[in-house]
């Protein structure tokens, strides 16, 4: 670790407790995060892990050195959802013979992956060290890196897989401690199965490693051997085996951190662990498992049927949410204002609050250079399980000092914010195109001023200060004075450019 700061502590889903982070090799800290399945544009729920683990990547780079952290985030470009999207979007072309299904699939995945890259760049995320695509790791490779077919063969040879009905499946009963991540006991799953189990499965929890493709579906020539007898199945890999192969290809059989959304704990991450441990004969796949919480939109589960399905592209490039486009930095801060393990209620109000805060920070930071500041305060907050809310409180305090004219605080504000991936633009870039006066709703400002006065009379000073900060972030300066006739506190306001 680069200095004398306290140790990094992370909540490990595997053990259900906070643990001090001790890398296997401080000279090469290794992290794998599940990336997108590129059949549709990434939504706001997908944005959360991208941003959260970007912050962790930035922190690890600062602690161990930029060249000593390897971050792998995959792209899943083989999946039945992709096949279905290709048929939906290019069905007429396929029927008319203008495109093959494989060509249509390639168009879907290339278009969607390109949009994903544009989205995450706008969110201020650093590029991962490696971004492998699943289709590049299906069959044995000339460079000797791990691949899916070889991993499946190893599982067969070690007695963890069987063939049935055109599929190769993982035998969960062959792994005594299957379910350790999700805390689901195999016996309970077998006893509690309430849906019909595929008759070709030995156990309800068994899952597909390789499945047969029809003549029309994409597929690879999978060549396997069972007890000396060859078995050739033209097919495609199961979802879980993809991440086991790609993580091993770049990070080895055991690595430091595996991350993703809470929804991936079971079955995806559980099954990754099963495959990897049984194939490699290791006690763990990764030492630390981190999961971000769920995202709701305006208090409801996000769903197209609810009409609240919001993509990152919608927010950045259309006026579908709140009647306007939103800067990526606003979206980033709105997500970081909630601790990564807590549920996040994404709302118009949260975006407005985040933008007001950023306006306030950019107003005071001026042309300060982050290289001249000290980012230690935010680093200390992040060392406690990526405590971004505490880190943002640090930035509020620095903004207050900077507003009083402290040049050192301006540089520190910039340096600390950059560690979170914020304040990465110049002041002019941020405010270009913003018509501050035109954006002011005078009635709304008067309402907030009146609310603040009520809070002051009730001696609720923290909430009153919060409103002042909110308005200040929008370029509105409050000036308190006494009414000369009644002696009561009054407030006037003006817009400061």
Swiss-Prot record:
Cofactor requirement: Zn(2+)
Binding site for ATP: 304
Keyword Lipid biosynthesis tagged: no
CDD domains reported for this sequence: CysRS_core
EC identifiers of the protein: 6.1.1.16
Cofactor binding comment, as recorded: Binds 1 zinc ion per subunit.
Record's subcellular location: Cytoplasm
Keywords of this entry: Aminoacyl-tRNA synthetase, ATP-binding, Cytoplasm, Ligase, Metal-binding, Nucleotide-binding, Protein biosynthesis, Zinc
UniProt xrefs under Gene3D superfamilies: Cysteine-tRNA ligase, C-terminal anti-codon recognition domain (1.20.120.1910), HUPs (3.40.50.620)
Complex and partners: Monomer.
Protein name in the entry: Cysteine--tRNA ligase
């Amino acid at each position: 670790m680069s200095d004398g700061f306290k140790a990094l502590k992370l909540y490990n889903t595997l053990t259900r407790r906070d643990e001090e982070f001790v890398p296997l090799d401080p000279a090469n800290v290794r992290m794998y995060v599940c990336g997108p399945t590129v059949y549709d544009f990434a939504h706001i729920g997908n944005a959360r892990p991208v941003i959260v683990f970007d912050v962790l990547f930035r922190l690890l780079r600062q602690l161990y050195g930029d060249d000593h952290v390897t971050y792998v985030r995959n792209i899943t470009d083989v999946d039945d959802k992709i096949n279905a999207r290709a048929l939906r979007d290019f069905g007429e072309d396929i029927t008319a013979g203008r495109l093959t299904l494989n060509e249509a699939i390639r168009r879907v995945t290339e278009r969607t992956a390109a949009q994903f890259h544009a989205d995450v760049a706008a969110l201020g995320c650093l590029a991962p060290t490696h971004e492998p695509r699943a289709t590049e790791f299906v069959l044995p490779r000339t460079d000797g890196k791990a691949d899916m077919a070889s991993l499946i063969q190893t599982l067969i040879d070690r007695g963890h897989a069987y063939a049935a009905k055109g599929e190769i499946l993982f035998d969960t009963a062959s792994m005594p401690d299957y379910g350790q991540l999700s805390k689901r006991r195999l016996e309970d799953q077998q006893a509690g199965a309430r849906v019909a189990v595929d008759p070709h499965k030995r156990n309800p929890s068994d899952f597909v490693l390789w499945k047969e493709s029809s003549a029309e579906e994409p597929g690879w020539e999978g060549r396997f051997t069972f007890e000396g007898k060859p078995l050739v199945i033209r097919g495609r890999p199961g979802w879980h085996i993809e991440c086991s192969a790609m993580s091993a290809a770049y990070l080895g059989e055991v690595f430091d951190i595996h991350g993703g959304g809470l929804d991936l704990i079971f079955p995806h991450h559980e099954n990754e662990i099963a495959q990897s441990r049984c194939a490699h004969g290791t006690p763990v796949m990764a030492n630390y498992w981190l999961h971000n919480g769920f995202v709701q939109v305006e208090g409801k589960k996000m769903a197209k049927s609810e009409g609240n399905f919001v993509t990152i592209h919608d927010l950045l490039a259309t006026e579908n949410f709140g009647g306007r486009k939103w800067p990526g930095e606003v979206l980033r801060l709105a997500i970081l204002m909630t601790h990564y393990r807590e549920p996040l209620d994404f709302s118009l109000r949260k975006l407005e609050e985040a933008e007001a805060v950023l306006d306030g920070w950019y107003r005071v930071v001026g042309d300060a250079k982050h290289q001249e500041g000290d980012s230690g305060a935010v680093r200390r907050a992040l060392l406690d399980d990526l405590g971004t809310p505490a880190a943002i409180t640090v930035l509020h305090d620095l903004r207050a000092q900077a507003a009083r004219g402290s040049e050192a605080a301006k540089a520190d504000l910039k340096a600390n914010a950059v560690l979170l991936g914020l304040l990465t633009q110049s002041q002019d870039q941020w405010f270009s195109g913003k018509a501050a006066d035109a954006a002011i709703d005078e009635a709304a400002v008067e309402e907030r001023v009146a609310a603040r006065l009520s809070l002051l009379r009730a001696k609720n000073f923290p909430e009153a200060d919060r409103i002042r900060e909110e308005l200040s972030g929008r370029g509105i300066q409050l000036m308190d004075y006494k009414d000369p006739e009644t002696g009561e506190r009054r407030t006037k306001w003006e817009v400061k450019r």
